[in-house]
Each structure stands twice: as structure tokens, then as C-alpha cells.
Amino acid sequence: MAKKSAPSTSNPFANEKEVEASVPDQVFSEPGEYERTISEAREIVNKPFVSAGLRNIQRQHLKNRMTVWERIAVLTDKTPKVLFQNWGPNLDGASLVTAIIDIEGRDVAVYGHDFTIRAGSMDATNGKKLARLYELAGRRKIPLVGMNDSSGAFVPAGVGGLDGYAEAFTALRKISGVVPSIMCMFGFNAGGGSYLPRQGSFLIQPDETFFGLTGPAVVKSVLGEDIEADDLGGPKVHSQTGVTDITAQDEVVALHKVK
């Protein structure tokens, strides 16, 4: 297991560099209606990036994992065209991010679970959001990249979480063979968070990750068997059974293999 780092909001895989402090679009005069409107718009646009809170970002980094936004930054150095679920003052950061990004001059549809919010779980709204991205990729004939880091269905939503998976499954199967879909498995994925991405064209799994219908704790409680997560759903066992197509050393290596 990798050595855990101290709590930090910095990307654990990023190179150290000096950043000059600046305030974007700073207005030195007395703010008027225009400045207030710009400020409100910027707050709405930035809300998904910060809604998780510093503590949840630190928890993600303590597990030696990147946030979904840091993973997108590895795939492209250009600003992603984020596909928001809705607009308005109530817009918040969903547990699923969908976007169109530019990778070496080519448009790519990408989604990523935000584990810092509801452990990346899925509900009906996110299922519909994911299905729309699949359909968009199929219509535009562009590749699809999935960055999976999800605990599965959002239990408090009841059957709504399962409805979301049903819609996403249907949409993904419709574009199968039409456009390539490359799925990356990050973190600890369970339930629908594990079997939906396996429907993709290729699956990449880094070391120290897991995906399976359930984890070791449930196996212990139901079958009375002790088993490690790596032996149950790690890259070693999945690559031997053919579930995982490509293994990688870590998240960054996996994302570079995508490119």
C-alpha cells in the first residue's frame, strides 16, 4: 500500500510549482449592477468545483486519489466544456461531472464521478445526465471516456438510483460499436458503479483500486469468509479473468494510457 500523505487540498500527483496570486476580472471601482451580475455568474459557474468542501477534498487526497477535476486536468490542459444539469442560484456540485474536452485537437465526451460528494453515488437525475452524454457522443461520433469512482446507487433515493442506472445502461448499449468507450476504474467501486463501466469497449484499472458487486465486509457477513479487497476485485484478479483489459501503476499512468 502507498504511504498516506498529510491532509492537503493539493493534487497528490501534481508537480510542485510557484503560483502568482491574482484576482481574475478584478474591478477596482465601486461595483455596480454589471459587476454584481458578473460576480453572481462566476459564483454559479465555480460552485461545482468548490461545493465538496476542503475536508472532503483532503479525504480524497489522503487516499492517494485525485478529485474528478484534477483527473480532467490530466487529460487536457484546456478548459472543459462542462455540461451542467441545470442553471440558477440552486445549482450545486453533483456527484457526477459530464463534459466535452479537447484531447490533442479532438473532442472527447468525458464523465467522472465526484467521490467528494455523496461518495460519487448515482440517483435518477445523474442517470439521466449520464445517458444524455452517451447519446451526445453517439450523435457526434466522438470517443467516450469514463472516470469511475462510485459507491453505486444513492440509497436514500430508493429505487430512483436504480432507475438512473437503467437509463444509463440502455444509452450505453445503444452506442456500443458506434463509438469507442474507454473506462477507467479509480478508488473503490461497488454495485452499479462496477458493472456499468464494464459495458464499455476497454477498461483500465490502476493498482490499489477495487470494483465488484460488493466488498469484503459483506462477503464476511454473508459467507463468513475473510478476503482482501485486492483478491476480490483488484487489478490482479480482474486482469487474469479478462474483466480488466489494461492495468496501470496509478491514476496518472491510467489517464495517459487513455490519451
Residue ranges and their predicted role:
Residues M1-V108, G112-A119, A248-K259:
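Intrinsically disordered, low-complexity segments enriched in small/flexible residues
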Residues A94-T98, D107, I142-P143, F169, ...:
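Short glycine-rich loop/turn motifs
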Residues I100-D114, K129-P156:
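A structural preference for short, pocket-lining loop segments at secondary-structure junctions
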Residues G93-V97, K128-R132, E167-A168, F188:
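Short alpha-helical segments and helix-capping/turn motifs at coil-helix boundaries
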Residues K3-K4, N148-K259:
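Conserved catalytic cores of soluble enzyme domains
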Residues T116-T125, A157-L162:
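Flexible beta-alpha connector loops of hexameric P-loop NTPases
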Residues A119-G127, F186, I227:
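Alpha-helix N-cap/helix-initiation motif
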Residues A109, M122-N126, M147, G164-E167:
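Glycine-rich phosphate- or other oxyanion-binding loops that anchor nucleotides, phosphorylated ligands
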